[in-house]
């Protein structure tokens, strides 16, 4: 059981004070009957709530797979730039957040949820969760780079980057690679290649914690996960 004003607030219908005004003005119905008491307790799993005639379903947890496009930031809100949450147009809850972050100019798989426990498990350094990236690199990548990445590249932090699995997809003036890392340091992939004298020109995350980006999703598109 939960208060009707809390229910509507969690579903992103406004602040608690705004919602109390909506309820008292008779714009909220529960099971087809108008309610005017914000403190009214309802069963969020069985009762139907509507605001201005529109049904507001309840979701305790939400999970989305987003194909983050370049130019969008991995944040919940920002005064200047569009955020990944701005792209989730049919979300129910107002407490969603991205699990980790991708750089502004990086695209690819990003999980969006309000499940803090899951996020902690996936982001904990102790878990060594695989993150797989596809990249285009300016410059030739060869087997010596594969070995260097496996040994751990010193990118200027207190400790070198952990062993990473570099797979060469195409080698030439512009190379294409797939890289699996288990850390999430600041600009890590770009810094690792920079140490080897190469520049990343395109970067996309294709897998995270065993979840692969749905190839049907274009940049900016998303789908719910169950």
Identify the role of each PLM range.
Residues 2-225:
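Basic, flexible Lys/Arg- and Gly-enriched helix-loop patches that mediate nucleic-acid binding at interfaces
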